[in-house]
């Protein structure tokens, strides 16, 4: 790599969705390629096809390369990976589009693991069309969990709200069985750790949502709050995690109580994402607690508007900004903790790090 700017790997996503449209619109602004070195994994042919369908994107000019090591400063670099010919059927879920998305993802993750890129930003995929004998994952998060180190947590981020999820892509009927006191305590510990290292929050305050309506109404609507969630919050607090709750989700968001906390832990997918997307439509999906940084825009393939020049690129921009910020915060955190200053315990009235001064014994003249 020819410069020291952060190398942002970006995957093309589903080629029949809005992935390429938001990528092209993002990098039509030349300032984006000045703040980082973008390395896009996908098909240059598909990129050209979508560019020709869009207006006001003359600034998008790409540099074709064979490997990330060839990426040039100030250029929008594209690595041609995946099938040489990808049939484009705008707005449709096809196996070909799914295969192209997976090929780009695998190539980018390989480079991420080998240090060829610094962070990863993924355009949306269709989880169903991405399935194959070689790819049996229900989403990016599950695939990254298998490829990278750490226990990932799906986390939605914006300037006003951060939401971590206890459970991700499982049926609602299985959520109650998937949570336990121990798992919630561990999730709170991981959430605290990522808020400290990745968001530079010294002592984050975390709100924990209830599972049942009205936080169970004292056990009338479910006992998970009494038997699992509240004990977990108490134990986490004893372990120096500033956790509070459980709070009934509807009132918590409707009242604006979320503004008092640095993050929220939701028990299941829609409990966290529905209010988040309402409050922060241009938010970012961050895979927390992994060894590498990965973000994505907070939207799906959007087949209904694909190819119509209607997609808003702001969430993609925010995903790139977030990846860069998190990478920098994590690097500073590592530097601060690499050689901490030696700490001495003080007893009241004296410094035990200093030897007591002994006066010479008095002698008679």
Task: Show where each model-derived region lies.
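Conserved hydrophobic/aromatic beta-strand scaffold that supports enzyme active sites
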Residues: 143, 154, 163-165, 294
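Contiguous, glycine/small-aliphatic-enriched amphipathic segments in soluble metabolic enzymes
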Residues: 1-139, 182-267, 271-285, 289-301, ...
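Glycine/threonine-rich beta-strand-loop-alpha-helix active-site module
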Residues: 131-154
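Flexible glycine-/small-residue-enriched beta->alpha junction loops
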Residues: 81-82, 150, 157-158
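A generic local secondary-structure boundary/capping motif
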Residues: 152-155, 196-198
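Ligand-binding beta-strand-loop-alpha-helix segment within the catalytic cores
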Residues: 156-186
């Amino acid at each position: 790599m020819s410069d020291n700017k952060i190398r942002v790997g970006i995957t093309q996503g589903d080629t029949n969705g809005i992935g390429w449209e938001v990528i092209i619109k993002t990098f039509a602004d030349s300032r984006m390629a000045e703040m980082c070195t973008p390395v896009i994994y996908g098909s240059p042919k598909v990129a050209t096809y979508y560019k020709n369908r869009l207006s006001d994107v003359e600034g998008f000019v790409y540099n074709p390369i064979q490997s990330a090591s060839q990426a040039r400063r100030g250029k929008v670099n594209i690595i041609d990976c995946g099938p040489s010919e990808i049939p484009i059927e705008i707005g449709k879920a096809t196996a070909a589009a799914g295969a192209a998305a997976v090929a780009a993802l695998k190539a980018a993750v390989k480079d991420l693991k080998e240090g060829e890129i610094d962070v990863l930003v993924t355009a949306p995929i269709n989880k169903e069309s991405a399935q194959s004998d070689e790819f049996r994952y229900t989403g990016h998060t599950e695939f990254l969990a298998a490829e990278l180190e750490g226990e990932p947590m799906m986390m939605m981020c914006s300037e006003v709200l951060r939401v971590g999820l206890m459970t991700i892509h499982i049926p609602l009927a299985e959520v109650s069985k998937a949570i336990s006191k121990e798992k919630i305590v561990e999730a709170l510990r991981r959430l605290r750790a990522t808020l400290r290292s990745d968001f530079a929050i010294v002592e984050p305050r975390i709100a924990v949502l209830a599972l049942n309506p009205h936080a169970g109404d004292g056990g009338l609507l479910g006992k998970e709050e009494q038997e699992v969630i509240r004990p977990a919050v108490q134990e986490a607090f004893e372990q120096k995690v500033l956790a509070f709750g459980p709070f009934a989700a509807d009132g918590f968001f409707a009242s604006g109580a979320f503004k008092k906390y640095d993050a929220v832990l939701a028990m299941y997918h829609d409990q966290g994402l529905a209010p988040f997307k309402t409050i922060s439509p241009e938010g970012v999906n961050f895979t927390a607690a992994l060894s590498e940084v990965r973000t994505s825009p907070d939207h799906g393939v959007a087949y209904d508007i694909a190819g119509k020049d209607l997609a808003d690129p702001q969430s993609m921009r925010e995903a790139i900004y977030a990846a860069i910020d998190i990478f920098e915060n994590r690097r500073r955190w590592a530097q601060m903790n690499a050689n901490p200053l030696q700490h001495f315990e003080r007893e009241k009235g004296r410094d035990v790090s200093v030897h007591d001064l002994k006066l010479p014994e008095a002698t008679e003249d």
